[in-house]
Amino acid sequence: AISTELGFDDLVSFDVNSDCELEYMIFGKLRLMISEDNFKDIIGENKDEFYYLKDTKNNTYQLRIDAHNHSQIYDEKTLDLTNHIEKLEKTAIDNLSLDLRLYNTTQTREIMKYIDSKVNKKQVYKLPEDMKTYTANFKKGLYKK
C-alpha cells in the first residue's frame, strides 16, 4: 500500500505502466505509531477491547495491543477520501481500500451506507456526528507548505 502521507500531486507522478499493483487507503483510521511498550503496567488485567491515550489538547488516540504485545496507536480522526475517488482513478493507483477493523458492526454498516451513497452518487448518507473525518495530506502532501 502507498503511504497516505503522499498527496495527490505525488500520486500522479507514479508510472501508470508499473508491474507493481498500487493500493491507497481512502477510508479508515490511520495508524500513527507502533510501540514495543505494550502499556500492560497501565492497563493491568483490564481486558477491554479498546484503550485510549489522551494528549494535552484532549485529543484521544485509540490504542490496540497486537498479538506480539506491541501497542498500535491510531489517529483520533477518520481518513475520508471518498470525495476524491474520481481523481484517484486518474492516477496509477490500482486498488482503493477501506480499513474498518476498528469499527464495530453497527458503525461498519453506517460507514458502508455512507460510502455506497458517495460511490453510487445517491443522496449522501451522513456519518454519525461524533465521527470526525479529514483528508490527511491528500491536498498538499506531507512536506509541502
For the regions a language model picked out, list residue spans one by one:
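Active-site pocket-lining/capping segments in soluble small-molecule metabolic enzymes
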Residues: 1-145
